[in-house]
Amino acid sequence: LMLEPDTKQTLKKYYEEGNFDEAREVISEICMELEASIDEEFFLSGATERPSDAFNKYLHPEDYLEKTSKCVIMTHARFLSLPTKLLKKFEIIIDEDILYNSMLTRVGSVKISTLENVLKESRLSYEARLEIENLLDLQEGKCYKKETYGRIELDIETIEKCKANDNLTEFLKAGCYMRQKDCIKYLPPIKFPKCKLIILSATLDNVIYELFFPTREFILHEVKQAAYMGNVIQYPAYSMSRNTIKNIIKSNDLSYSTPAMLFKKILSYTYNVTYGITFKKYEKDLPLKNTLHFGNLAGTDCYSGKNGVIIGTPHFPTYLYELIACTIDISESSTNSYKNRRVNYKGDRFRMMSYKNEILQRIQFYLISSELEQAVGRSRLLRTNNTVFVFSNFPCEQADFCEFDYLKNADVPKQDTDQRL
């Protein structure tokens, strides 16, 4: 649907603020304009339903789902927004790991200045004021878990007066919080609808699921891993984390004084590469026409059957690991625990920045592995005979390892925190 730039920007603003009612009103107005413009040629062109009917399915899916017996395809986010009572009438099949893709990584942020502006509003309820004051009083770097969810709401007028783009509605309904210097990070409650779910995923970790949903019954049907038709060639001499890349560039070896020079050297160990994946910060430095970055990979199918290169170990921010752990009552601060240590992952031993707590380690491995396998999956190796080159010390599935120092001419600092053993 083609939208006017102003309309598109307005919708984007409402969604970012969590103001979904206002967004629905804008979409309804667009629908009315379309409805007024249709004529006989509209249906002669092959259209099977009026714009108003199609829009109503999107805006009010509950009404449609109550009546239909058809197969319905929707996003993870839309599925998680629907009531359990409605979902129970369907056989639900979820494609991909919904816990990783749509729940654990949905961390949000609200600026301290925004919350201070909210406190200036005279219309603010006593409960909301007390909640915000308590959150502002949090010790920096320490997680806080709220025992009851969704009790407090702000009216639209208060949100508009604050002139903030932060999602205050979602913020006050969150489950766990961590104060940082100029903002408060938060993680929405991690909840599944109470009905039967069938989840199909190659990265699903049943232990992680049981940690977050201890009262649910899980039946795991493991399917033997299919051998890749293509190949994964992995170079584990360096983690190529953001910190490692930065340290290599800062070293005294002028051969790699810029990310572009470093990536050019790395690419010399590959062949016929069509696309590259690395961190968003360094994406423009990849000397390739086609690039992607970690965190923005799902659904990309245009590189099926193409050779690709992946540079980096996609570590997540420590506040995300700790917020996730807080939801299952595990408290461990990165200040004292997040260190360079020897770890064991699926029988492979190597060094990386990680936690002492084994459950926190497992959460960290789950997130990193899921993102790396998502990256490898862009070439569709199960059904195409091509090659993905991975430059990371975090082991990928079915990888053939090339154990040598491919930057041996570089004066890499000994403090490389994630170097493989």
Predicted features by range, described:
Residues 1-421:
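ASCE RecA-like P-loop NTPase motor cores
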